[in-house]
Amino acid sequence: MKADFMERIDFASAPVSAIERRLLRIADCERRVAAAEAALEHELAPRYSDWADLERIYAAFCNSPHADVTPVERRERFVLIALLLFAPGALLGRSVPRGMGRELSRVLGESKFAVSRCLSSLPLRYRLYMRRKADLWLRDVTERLHNEERGL
C-alpha cells in the first residue's frame, strides 16, 4: 500500500507540501491500523479463565428462554458463548485452550465427540460470517479513501 502511494507521486514536479501531506497521510493510516490491531488484541483477551465459571454461566444460560431451540442449537449457542468468554481468539483461528472441550463436555453432559465437533465447526462458520462483514467494511473504507483522494 505504501509503495502504491509513493508511485503516484511525481517527486520532480510536485510541490514539497503535496509530498509532505501525502507522507503524513500514510503515517496517519499506519497509526490507525496499529491502533485497530491493538483494540482487536484487547477484544480477543478472554474474560474468564477459571473453568468453574462455566457451570455458573451454563446455569444462567439455561434460565434464559429456549422454547423453540433444538438440543443441538442449544449446545451450539452455549459453546459459542463459552468461546466468546473464555477463548474469543479461537473464533478467529487461534487454538482452543487446553481442557476446554473436556470441561464443556462435563458441563453440558454430552459426549466429547459432539462437543469437539461443535468446537471445530463453529469457528469456521463464524470466520466465514466475519469475513463477509470484513469484506463489506473494507469495500466501504476503500471507497472513502478514493473519494478523499479525488476531493469528493
Protein language model regions, located:
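Short alpha-helical "recognition helix" segments of helix-turn-helix
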Residues: 93-111
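Extended, non-core accessory segments
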Residues: 11, 88-93, 121, 126-128
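Major-groove recognition helix of helix-turn-helix-like DNA-binding domains
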Residues: 110-126
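Short Lys/Arg-enriched helix C-cap and helix-to-coil transition segments
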Residues: 126-149
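Short, Lys/Arg-enriched N-terminal segment that forms or immediately precedes the first helix
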Residues: 55-70
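Short, amphipathic alpha-helical "recognition" segments used to contact nucleic acids or chromatin
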Residues: 73-98
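General nucleic-acid-binding
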Residues: 1-58
